[in-house]
Amino acid sequence: TGGVGRRTHNRFKIVDLKPDTRKPNERRCGVVRPLDPKQTVYLSVFNEESQENGFGRVNLARPSKTLEYFTDTVTYKYVAGAAGTDRIFYQKGNFRECYDLYFTDNFFKTSTKVSAINPQMAGYRWGSAELFRWKAYDGTPLKGIVFMPDGVKEGEKLPVMIYFYEKNANNLYTFWSPAPSRSIVNIPFYTSRGYIVFVPDIVYKVGHPGESAYNCICAGAEALCEAYPSADRSRMAIQGQSWGGYQTAWLITRTNMFAAVGSGAPVGNMTSAYGGIRWGSGITRAGQYEHGQSRIGKSMWEPGALELYIENSPVFHVDKVQTPVLIMHNDADGAVPWYQGIEFFSDLRRLDKPAWLLQYNKEAHNLVERRNCKDLSVRLQQFFDHYLKGAPMPVWMKTGVPYESKGEYSGFDNAE
C-alpha cells in the first residue's frame, strides 16, 4: 500500500471471497492459499487509534495507486461474496446494534439491510460505549472503553464495575450479547442496571505483572472518576477471570480502592503453580511463567527470581486484604489448577477476611451448563449489588450453603 497503513494507523488484512478449499490439516497448520499477484482483493480495515473498522480493496499489482477503503464506528463481519464482483453479504454492529445482515453490490456505496434479528433491544436501557484515554502512574499512555448507562441524570452518582483482560480497547465497537455468565460480568446486563462499566488496557513490565496491573488499572479508575462526574469513587468494583482473576486477587493485596472484587480461577501462589501442569493439555506450567502470559521472565532458581515469584503471589500478602472477594474456581478446571483457588480462599479464611468460594461440580475453566451460568450470574449480581448498591445480603453470603444442600438450596433469599 505504499506505507498508507503505517501513516494512517490502519491495519489491512485480505478477505478471501473464494470458498475455502483447503484440507482440514492444511487449515489447522495455517497453510495460506496463494494469491494471483495481479488480482484485486478485498480487505478488512482496523484503525488502531480510533478503533474503527471497515472494508477496502486493492489491486495487488498496483497497491499504492488502487487502494480504496473506509472505516466506521461499527464492527464489520464478512459473510459471503461472489469472486470477481462487488456483491457481498456482510454483518455490522456495535454496542447498541446487534450484527444484522446487509447486502451491497457497489462496494458499500449503498447497502440493503436484510435482517432485523433483535428488535426487542429497543425496550431496554442498553447504554453506550466510548473510547477513554489516560496515563498510567508511570506515564504510559493507555486506552480503554467506558460503557455508560442510558438516561444518566445530572448530579447522579453511579457504581462502577471494572472488567479487564490484557487489552480490549479494540472491542470498542463490538456487540456484547446479554447472556448468563460463564465466568465474567456481562456488560450490557450491568449497564442496563445503572452501572458504569470500565474496561482498561494493561501494558506489562516483565517480572512485575501484579504491579503492572496496579499501574494501569488503578490509574485508570482514578482518571475515570475525574473525567466522569457520575462515577462514584467510593463504589467501584473489579472483576476478572483466569489471568484477570489472578490480577484481581493480587490487586486487593496492594490497594483498598475497591468496594468489592470478583476473582475467577485465580493463581494464588506462583511458587506452587510453577511446578504443576495444565490438566487439560498435560503441558507443564513452568513455561507460562518463564516466557508466557504470567511474565515473570525467569525460572524460579535464577538469581533474584524467587523474590519475583513471591512478590507476584497473592497468598504471601493476604494479611493486607480488606476488600470483600468472591472467588469462583471449579474442580474440572484444565487451565488453572483448582487447588490454586482453594489455597487463596483458605488463606483468606484463616485470617478471617471477607471471602466466598464458588465451586461448580464437574465444570471447567469457564462454565458450560446453563443452569450453572444462571446461578453464577445471580450470585455476582447479589454480591456486587450488596456492596455497591446497598442491597440486602443474601443467605448464601451471610451463613453459607451447607455442602449437603448444594444444588438443592440456592440461598438467594435475603438474610436480613
Q: What positions do the PLM features span?
A:
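A short beta-strand motif characteristic of beta-propeller blades
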Residues: 14-22, 65-70
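The conserved beta1-alpha1 loop
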Residues: 164-166, 329
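Serine-hydrolase catalytic-loop signature spanning alpha/beta hydrolases and amidase-signature enzymes
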Residues: 168-170, 197
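A flexible loop/linker signature enriched in serine peptidases of the S9 family
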Residues: 1-11, 19-27, 36, 44-54, ...
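Non-catalytic accessory segments flanking enzyme active sites
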Residues: 29-34, 44-46, 52-56, 62-156, ...
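Active-site-proximal cap/loop segments of hydrolase catalytic domains
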Residues: 177-416
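Hydrophobic beta-strand anchors of alpha/beta hydrolase catalytic cores
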Residues: 159-163, 197
